[in-house]
Amino acid sequence: MRGLPGCELSLDPGRSRFERIYARLLGAPANGLRIRLRRVLPATDGDHRAILDAGCGPGVFSFELAKRHPQAQVLGIELEPDLVERASEIARRAGLTNCRFEKGDVTQLDFDGKFDLVVSVDNLEHVEDDVTAMKTLLRALRPGGTLAVHVPAYERRWLLFGRRVNFDVPGHVRPGYRAPELAEKLRLAEFDVIDQRYTYGPLETFTNNLSYLISGADQRNKALYAVAFPVLLAVSYLGKFSNPSWGAGVLIKARRPDEPTVPGPA
């Protein structure tokens, strides 16, 4: 199935008929998610054969990874069994034969060097022992494999003026991370940090703030958000080419070090 990012949600049996039609026409109806897709997916480019989406939620990133990397097998791991079941059914209906889902905890994954690429998007802020989770993701990668991790920044710009601590979202154990802090924790987990940057430029942050004012973390005011979403999406899209020196999200690309070469006998 091809189309706008997240259009696979139109196949979700747990959504209403209106929600399915809306997703078919406009893709995933979540402005923040669409911003993250635009910012994170380019960091996943490469000739990957096995990809892990750690903490995949409803599966939208997994679907996009499966389409972007048709040569790869994509596994989405999620703690909520209902989301796993629904994402699995969506992948089946969409014909994404290279995408599957399992129930799992990112702090307790039992994969040893299986994946070329691990993606973790807005997940670590939910995990109390985040360094342990990072070490688990390291073990899941083959030596030389790549991690693309995105998290909320500790602070965000409120509307167009000033900064304040990021949104207090239910389920978050911390508001977010500063880029140097996240990079240091990844190094503690024995990753080599390749690149670190902030995401969400001014226009993207502005529209994301408005989205949150309308719908909050509990997706309230769905009718109002359905009307506002196309405008918010269009405005945020104009900010896609910005390269913010500071923003409301943090994106880091890292790698698992190669195994040391053991010298042969003299």
Language-model features: locations:
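Conserved N-terminal segment of class I S-adenosyl-L-methionine
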Residues: 1-113, 117-121, 131-134, 175-176, ...
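Short glycine/proline- and charge-enriched loop/turn segments
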Residues: 20-21, 161-170, 210-216
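Conserved catalytic loop of SAM-dependent methyltransferase domains
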Residues: 194-220, 226-229
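A short glycine-rich, Lys/Arg-flanked "PGG" loop and its adjoining helix->strand segment in the class I
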Residues: 131-146
